[in-house]
Amino acid sequence: MKNKIGISAGLLSGLFWGLGLTISAYIFSLYNVSPFAVAVIHDFISIFVLLAIILVKYKKVNFRIFTNIKSISVIIGALLAGPIGMQCNLYAVKYIGSGLTSSITAIYPAVSVILAVIFLKNKVSSKTIIGIVLIIVGIFIQSYKSEQVESFYLGFMFALICAIAWGSESVLSSYAMKNNLNELETLLIRQVTSFLAYLVIISFNGLGIETSLDVKFGGLIVFFVVSNMVSYILYYMAINRLEPAKATGLNVSYVVWTIIFSMIFVGLAVNVQLVVTSLIIILGVYVIVREE
């Protein structure tokens, strides 16, 4: 039962993350706002959403989790996956383009596997490894574009750091949850840390909002936050029940969901490569799920 709940949570986390990405792309197409401004607003609202959920479920909020030394792994994971990963991703796109960046950062599930085996002593089955390899191959082919770049090695370095940062989050969060932190508490620490870090960044760079905002923007932001928060909660449930390797492999199905939602809501054009690579990714997810 625990594994079935974890698998369902992992798959649904990908669905809601894909929906969130589609909404964010729509926001950026309509409004001239920086990703960091949206990230700050997102994290700020998500903190109160989490506090409300925790109060409803547990009747109180244990703020001592923020001073517990065992929470340090979540804080490190939040900094790696949030501001550091995001900055490196943006620099990689700047130097080598979005296609190559997406292809390189697609290895982050493999990073989770390696780190989980080394630091958590997790045993990873051959089917999980095969599934993750299929997913990475599918994403790589789907996003790769032959681009002439002058600063390839610099861009490659930033993309690789981004993949390592993203892959580290699930392992560090898993470690924290093995030390008596539940999923909601772990996620609350993550969001508070991420918000404060982004706040520092925009204090130096500015908020980056160069357009007038309206009620529609507010509605889209709320929809975006809700989608992402549902995804985060489900993802952390999957990490806690399945171990980082399998949870990451299921979560990365967001790539396919993003394509589906983009086709429905923004009219994304479909080609043979997109269909074939999506099927490869789905096959990889199926292999991971069928292990049970």
Positions of predicted regions on the chain:
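Glycine-/small-residue-enriched transmembrane alpha-helix faces in small-molecule transporters
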Residues: 1-40, 148-175
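Helix-helix packing/entry segments at the starts of transmembrane helices
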Residues: 12-14, 41, 82, 86, ...
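Specific transmembrane alpha-helical segments of multi-pass solute transporters/efflux pumps
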Residues: 20, 58-99, 141, 222-242
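Membrane-interface helix-cap regions at the ends of transmembrane helices
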Residues: 26, 46-67, 137-150, 194-216, ...
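Hydrophobic/aromatic residues within transmembrane alpha-helices
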Residues: 27, 38, 42, 92, ...
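Transmembrane alpha-helices of multi-pass small-molecule transport proteins
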Residues: 31-84, 165-169, 187-206, 222, ...
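Hydrophobic transmembrane alpha-helices of multi-pass small-molecule transport proteins
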Residues: 50, 115, 124-144, 252, ...
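C-terminal transmembrane-helix exit sites in multi-pass transporters
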Residues: 54, 89, 109-133, 256-275
